[in-house]
Amino acid sequence: MLITNAELVDGRVVDLRVAGERIDAVAADLDRAADAASAADPDSDDETVVDADGNLLLPGAIDAHVHFREPGFSHKETWETGTRSAAAGGVTTVIDMPNTSPPTATGDAFDAKAAAAEAACIDYGLNGGVTGDWDPDSLFDRPLCALGEVFLADSTGDMGVAPDDFEAAVDRAVAEDVTVTVHAEDETLFDESARDGDAGGCGRDANADLWSAYRTADAEAAAVEYATEVGRETSADIHIAHTSTPEGIAAAVDGGATCEVCPHHLYL
């Protein structure tokens, strides 16, 4: 395939040739001898030519934090609907989080999710989770992308773990050379007074303002500092999920961790 007149992110307008599944060449004016043959007979074996007409050409995006909710909550989303939506938005690889039902915290649960993921139309990976009764022996026998989110406070799926369990999980991940993705909130710093507000306070029916008031910025920053401290002490590869405050990002950077941010945390 030859893609012509495509704009790259640096402003250059180029042609790009794809051979099989790899980019073969990028240049200002690649050979367009196949244009006429392709136009005359689109079903021929000759090279297909696509005129990008000056539109941006980007590589497929990788979304390393998705919740496709299958198995267990397929009324919300499935691997088919989630990956079709991702593909429509230019996302070609996704990594799914473990707070499904059952949680992806055992080898059998991983296998069940892997079976559901066969409906995916793009590339994917699966993370493993930590619960009070997880089975690390069977879980780490599977091809995990990472361990986590490991929840330092309860959230969707009620998979919050105590500090001792978190530290034990990090130790095991280090032994297995697996990255630990952390949902970083210190629930001792949640603002209990927000529970007295309208619209449910902090539960599933809460409005956005009260939810944010309850799960405070200080709770995130403190948990990031704790997680990165554990990471430094164990030489773990720590990744902080969905940082939502400048303080949380600063704590991740200062602590030697990587972190991610959601578009709605930037723009809403």
Question: Can you say where each PLM-predicted feature lies in the sequence?
Answer:
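Histidine-rich, glycine-flanked metal-binding segment
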Residues: 1-59
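Divalent metal-coordination and catalytic microenvironments
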Residues: 6, 21, 54, 65, ...
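Metal-associated gating/positioning segment near the N- to mid-region
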Residues: 53-119
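Short, acidic/polar
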Residues: 75-83, 131-142
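Short catalytic-loop micro-motif centered on adjacent basic/acidic residues
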Residues: 95-96, 125-127, 236-242
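A glycine-rich helix N-cap at a beta->alpha junction
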Residues: 115-130
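Histidine/acidic residue-rich metal-binding segments in metalloenzymes
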Residues: 134, 138-150, 155-268
